[in-house]
């Protein structure tokens, strides 16, 4: 894309030169020359260039005094069409100057003190399980597991250690960590272009929105698409690592709160007491850093955390004092990150982009570097990458799986047999596969829900959020299942430092959206931004669901259609968390508080999606039995977040792991007979 001299000058007013380079020389020129993704802005930039010429009244825009250039840009930015066109220029300027990306070190990163890998740290790659390849795949296994995330990984480990011959099918390529971090334009959490952890083209979904249905392919908006992570290890490859236990009330939501009209709250078929031994094992097997104290008083424990909690940092100190003034309990967040060397891997080096990016030293604990390597070490587990299960069949004597392998090259169809098929593809894809295969009852796909989120931020007088990880540091559970917020409330944690591009694009109120003052804020006061993030109960509804859409994927299968309804009780949770977050920040001395708001139904699915094959004691109100077997089937077992009847007031991954341990342990002890077709 060509930029005229006038547009280049405009870029340098959006990000002016001072003692640091201006926008064009500081990264935008190189970005524009190298990026293939900017075609969306071509018409807007042509209009903007022409309008600048008109406003300059015959003089080249580049020759005007900086103050005059700013005046004209402000005129443009105040009109409807001009505002949209100028916003396109501003976006490109910020992407070029503040976005980390492969092979580029724009000046904005140095301006804000951002280093993706801390100085002096030598990256360490994960030793991923090898690819068995098409030629190594047997046609007959004891178990075929679809998905390598926390549920599938746990199932693979327990079954392989029990002597069962296992095949894990993973849709993603065997990508190294280096390919899954450091690109702030395509990272899973902040992707503005095709996400690196996305499934790619040929994997459409339909978002059934109130205003109109929208077809999204695997290269589109990661948020609206409902992307978790298309990677070996699933979401645990890229997560922040918050590893909470659900509270006892989280397993009894219907009993504790009743069922508001239009909702489908249900109790789990297990209690916290039933789950506690599996939580203890999950923390040990995964590797969780934490400490006993205020955050563990309501979740009785039989073991201590295997790793010490991460040390303090400025935001924790400030918010801890504020919590104590309010009489709230607080503590360090339990994280599945190595706070010290563990399991043959290094300690966390506190990189500034833990959330949504792979770890530079393999200190982030997930399925890819814990459960699956242990499964492979038995000699009983194969992993087939770059492969998709397109159909599963349940039978009296065996189960069948149809797989498309080598999907990034010349695809090959494989027809495989197993005693058991474990479906662990996440709440959306698990439901889609079961529905497309004609498996299960009417509850398959229903009760899709996630969490409710609230973010409040302000400014304090000191630097509290420099670019140093791992990210979230302090939490309070005082508003979880207490009288302060209805319907179970949610956990409140400190907000992670926003990545440079995100911070530049969304400065705090009162800071100009571009120009000299904006750049000065980025260089200094940005680190004084203190936020509190709330994550709480979302009340499930039967019509929030995954169905089969009127689109086809590259194999001719129907894509998932996602419908999200928001119950008024969920909004009460969200608003309640915002009130308590503001209270905490005021106690910490923050000023200029503002609530970051998004659409009520930003996405029907996301990282925490659950409930689409929920467990229960009765097929009239659930999709599976208490051990993940869809009602009416013999040899199909679900083993992921789809099983969650409700999703708790905290992050769900440790519960996914603990429940997978319980489900897989039962499967080992109740293996289906190969001839009679029954489960003991």
Please annotate each region the language model reported.
Residues 2-135:
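Mature-region segments of soluble proteins
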Residues 212-235, 239-240, 244-245, 250, ...:
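FAD cofactor-binding and catalytic pocket of flavoenzymes
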């Amino acid at each position: 894309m060509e930029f005229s001299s006038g547009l280049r000058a405009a870029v340098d007013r959006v990000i002016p030169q001072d003692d640091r380079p201006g926008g064009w020389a500081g990264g935008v020129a190189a970005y524009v020359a190298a990026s293939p993704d900017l075609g969306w802005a071509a018409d807007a930039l042509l209009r903007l260039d022409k309008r600048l010429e008109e406003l300059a009244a015959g003089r080249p825009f580049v020759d005007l005094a900086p103050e005059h250039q700013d005046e004209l840009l402000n005129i443009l930015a105040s009109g409807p069409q001009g505002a949209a066109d100028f916003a396109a220029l501003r976006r490109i300027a910020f992407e070029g100057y503040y976005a980390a990306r492969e092979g580029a070190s724009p000046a904005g990163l140095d301006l804000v003190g951002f280093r993706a890998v801390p100085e002096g740290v030598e990256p360490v790659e994960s030793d991923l399980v090898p690819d068995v390849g098409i030629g190594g795949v047997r046609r007959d296994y004891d178990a075929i597991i679809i998905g390598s995330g926390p549920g599938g990984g746990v199932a693979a480990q327990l079954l392989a250690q029990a002597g069962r011959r296992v095949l894990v099918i993973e849709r993603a390529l065997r990508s190294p960590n280096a390919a899954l971090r450091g690109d702030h334009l395509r990272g899973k959490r902040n992707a503005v272009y095709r996400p690196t952890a996305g499934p790619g083209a040929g994997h459409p979904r339909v978002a059934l929105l109130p205003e109109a249905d929208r077809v999204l392919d695997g290269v589109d908006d990661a948020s609206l698409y409902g992307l978790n992570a298309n990677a070996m290890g699933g979401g645990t490859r890229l997560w922040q690592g918050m590893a909470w236990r659900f509270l006892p009330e989280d397993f009894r939501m219907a009993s504790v709160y009743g069922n508001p009209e239009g909702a489908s709250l249900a109790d789990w078929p297990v209690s916290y007491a039933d789950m506690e031994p599996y939580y203890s094992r999950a923390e040990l097997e995964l590797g969780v850093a934490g400490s006993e104290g205020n955050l563990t008083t309501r979740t009785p424990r039989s073991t201590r955390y295997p790793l010490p909690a991460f040390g303090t940092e400025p935001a924790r100190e400030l918010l801890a004092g504020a919590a104590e003034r309010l009489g709230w309990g607080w503590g360090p967040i339990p994280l599945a990150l190595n706070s010290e060397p563990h399991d043959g891997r290094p300690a966390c080096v506190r990189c500034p982009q833990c959330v949504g990016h792979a770890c530079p030293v393999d200190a982030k604990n997930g399925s890819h570097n814990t459960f699956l390597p242990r499964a492979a070490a038995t000699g009983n587990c194969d992993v087939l990458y770059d492969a998709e299960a397109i159909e599963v069949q349940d039978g009296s004597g065996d189960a069948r799986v149809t797989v498309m392998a080598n999907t990034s090259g010349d695809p090959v169809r494989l027809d495989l047999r197993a005693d058991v098929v474990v479906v662990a593809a996440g709440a959306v894809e698990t439901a889609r596969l079961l529905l497309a295969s004609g498996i299960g009852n009417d509850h398959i796909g229903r009760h899709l829900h996630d969490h409710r989120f609230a973010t409040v931020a302000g400014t304090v007088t000191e630097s509290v959020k420099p670019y140093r990880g791992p990210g979230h540091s302090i939490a309070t559970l005082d508003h979880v299942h207490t009288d302060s917020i209805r319907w179970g409330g949610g956990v409140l944690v400190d907000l992670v430092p926003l990545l440079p591009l995100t911070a530049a694009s969304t400065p705090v109120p009162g800071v100009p959206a571009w120009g000299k003052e904006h750049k000065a804020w980025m260089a200094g006061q940005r680190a004084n931004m203190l936020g509190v993030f709330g994550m709480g109960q979302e009340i499930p509804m039967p019509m929030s669901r995954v169905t089969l859409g009127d689109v086809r994927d590259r194999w001719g299968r129907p894509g998932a259609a996602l419908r999200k309804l928001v119950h008024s009780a969920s909004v009460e949770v969200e608003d309640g968390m915002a009130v308590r977050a503001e209270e905490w920040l005021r106690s910490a001395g923050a000023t200029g508080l503002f609530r970051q708001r998004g659409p009520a139904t930003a996405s029907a699915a996301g990282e925490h999606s659950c409930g689409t094959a929920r467990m229960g004691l009765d097929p009239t109100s659930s999709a599976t039995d208490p051990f993940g077997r869809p009602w009416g089937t013999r040899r199909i077992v679900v083993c992921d977040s789809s099983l969650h009847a409700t999703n708790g007031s905290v992050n769900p991954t440790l519960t996914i792991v603990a429940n997978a341990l319980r489900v897989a342990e039962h499967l080992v002890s109740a293996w289906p007979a190969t001839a009679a077709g029954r489960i003991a």
